[in-house]
Regions:
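Catalytic cores of secreted/periplasmic lytic hydrolases that degrade extracellular macromolecules
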Residues: 5, 92-108
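Secretory-pathway/luminal and periplasmic proteins that interact with or process carbohydrate-rich
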Residues: 37-44, 94-99
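Second-shell loop/turn segments in exported
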Residues: 3-6, 16-20, 42, 46-47, ...
Length: 108
């Protein structure tokens, strides 16, 4: 089944996701990581507008810059711990819609 294959690819990240997400959100978070980066923290997606999406969560250049300014942190999007903490903040403060472009892949 496709859902199981998605989760198997990102099982290495399950402890990190469990540490930062509510139980009800763990599967969704793992599926987003699968859909966005196939669980690869160094994944880079190039966009037609010249920006890049980077890391497990595929944070866009503009979104990452905005979050760094807003939350006053430093660090790299390819850092799986940092990017997961930032994703957690974004999801629990602003919702899942930031990953709507891949929703066809991760929605239940």
């Amino acid at each position: 089944r496709e859902d199981l294959r998605q989760i198997e690819v990102v099982l290495d990240w399950q402890p990190l996701i469990q540490e930062h997400f509510q139980d009800k959100d763990i599967v969704r978070a793992l599926k987003i990581i699968y859909c966005e980066s196939s669980g690869r923290p160094n994944a880079v997606g190039k966009n037609t507008n010249g920006t890049q999406d980077v890391g497990l969560w595929q944070f866009n250049d503009n979104t990452w810059a905005w979050l760094k300014e807003k939350l006053k942190f430093t660090g790299n999007r390819s850092d799986p711990i940092l990017s997961t903490k930032v994703a957690k903040w974004l999801i629990y403060n602003d919702g899942w819609y930031h990953w709507n472009s891949s929703k066809h892949c991760w929605r239940y």
